[in-house]
Amino acid sequence: MKLYCLSGHPTLPCNVLKFKSTTIMLDCGLDMTSTLNFLPLPLVQSPRLSNLPGWSLKDGNAFLDKELKECSGHVFVDSVPEFCLPETELIDLSTVDVILISNYHCMMALPYITEHTGFTGTVYATEPTVQIGRLLMEELVNFIERVPKAQSASLWKNKDIQRLLPSPLKDAVEVSTWRRCYTMQEVNSALSKIQLVGYSQKIELFGAVQVTPLSSGYALGSSNWIIQSHYEKVSYVSGSSLLTTHPQPMDQASLKNSDVLILTGLTQIPTANPDSMVGEFCSNLALTVRNGGNVLVPCYPSGVIYDLLECLYQYIDSAGLSSIPFYFISPVANSSLEFSQIFAEWLCHNKQTKVYLPEPPFPHAELIQTNKLKHYPSIHGDFSNDFRQPCVVFTGHPSLRFGDVVHFMELWGKSSLNTVIFTEPDFSYLEALAPYQPLAMKCIYCPIDTRLNFIQVSKLLKEVQPLHVVCPEQYTQPTPAQSHRMDLMVDCQPPAMSYRRAEVLALPFKRRYEKIEIMPELADSLVPMEIKPGISLATVSAVLHTKDNKHVLQPPPRPTQPTGGKKRKRASDDIPDCKVLKPLLSGSIPVDQFVQTLEKHGFSDIKVEDTAKGHIVLLQEAETLIQIEEDSTHIICDDDEVLRVRLRDLVLKFLQKF
């Protein structure tokens, strides 16, 4: 069993598991932190960004000044943002049989894999994962395509040039694998390969293994996966949460008795408590608005935004914010808000019961009805007419490199009355803000990450007790900034095995058994013999029939009677005739009694030596060697067949035939 690690990002994993003749890809996350190295794409022409000076090498060579621009001491690539893809050279991705998706954040690289690697298999995911994943991809494509950029920068990617660049460009990894965004045509083609599944649904893969999605408690439709055969079990835990938010709670019981547990997608902010972060978010938002400022919340169109809107729904009136407009701007804003209300079966129990009252499971429906929350596809059109300040704007992209958020950063960045509040943990907020410096607006960092922290995961591992744990190397040691915090790492026994990008891990786990069915008529013909009290054995002569990884023992064909004349050969004639087999032997040879038997039969000068696997009996006079081991006995003599047969018969006296 082998695990191929194709991604270096622990919360955006992409691994390939080879297990029992099947090749299974576990998630295909897309690392978007690479976009932080690029200049933002403004919706409206930005004189500030257009007039940034080009960057030149120290020797004065200016051939890079069209590709690289400098802003407040940072250097950025002036080109369409590119994304860091999973490894494509470590394994032939056309051999992947299936892809298992755990949540909508972990499927963003799907079009790159299904459309450009020769992949012909099936993708499995829950319906909310597919629908919300489609929205995220559609928004991403829309953000990139609506601001076309004429030039494409590639000179800086040359290894000899890259090492001369300042950080972080100099330290950027795998820049040769970075790619532009896919198209909607590729998105639709990739999503057409997905087969929808439900929680606890068992899916057979070629008769070899069975995969089952379990609720992970992190997002609508998010899943952990069980991959098992008749005698082995692998659990894949990715993006899980024990907090009571809007999704169904995590299914922990089904993870028990795993031979291997692959652990990914833990919280990116282990020291931040989500509840206190939400409290800080609300209080900072209220403070800014009361002082006449605007609040900008860079966000994804699904996920945490549902919980934030629910908290604000409860907070608005008590904080005196009922007259303040809330705007949600995204090409998929309307679809996202509607989807959240119709996936009732995937919600936690409290929200499911509201559906039958009838009452919308999320309160943002009421915010929309009362005009406190308005949603728009972009800043153009209706939004321009309805826009009034002070206000709160939820919009993407959290990287601040594309989307409507770029316009608001340019619009509000010069005033200290305004505040940008970062709630998504995927991007360093300091790096996200770098191309907007100098910045007068206030910046608040309230990362809300509900995924498992190290204390929770260590407790979980003690409860489910897998034989082996495998995880990214980032989880096996504290971060360099907090090297003294030994509690910020996975604690389990035996210690977890770690992996990194482009590494192949041989899992410490060997398959020992295979299930074989036996036909009833063959079972009737067996004659068991008791070899020990309570233990019986029977020999089986049969034909092993294997199809779709299912093995069946069938009765052997009866010997055909020879007939005169020539006959056309039939397909059944290819089956070999049943041969009369020699009896099998069982038992053990007690050395002391065997030596006594040899002496009784005239052998002398006998010497016994112990070995690691058994004993060696030397008949020095006859120049003969008898090796007695647990599973075999060898008689070695020099071309004396009579002596060999005589010794063989003495050995057989100690063994049972059946």
From Swiss-Prot:
Pfam families: Beta-Casp (PF10996), IntS9_C (PF21382), Lactamase_B_6 (PF16661). CDD domains: Int9-like_MBL-fold (cd16294). Keywords: Cytoplasm, Isopeptide bond, Nucleus, Ubl conjugation. It is found in: Nucleus; Cytoplasm. It comes from Bos taurus (Bovine). This is Integrator complex subunit 9. Residues 548-573 are annotated as: Disordered. GO terms for cellular component: cytoplasm; INTAC complex; integrator complex; nucleus. InterPro entries: Beta_Casp, Integrator_9su, IntS9-like_C, Metallo-B-lactamas, RibonucZ/Hydroxyglut_hydro. Although strongly related to RNA-specific endonuclease proteins, it lacks the HXHXDH motif that binds zinc and participates in the catalytic center. Its function as endonuclease is therefore unsure.
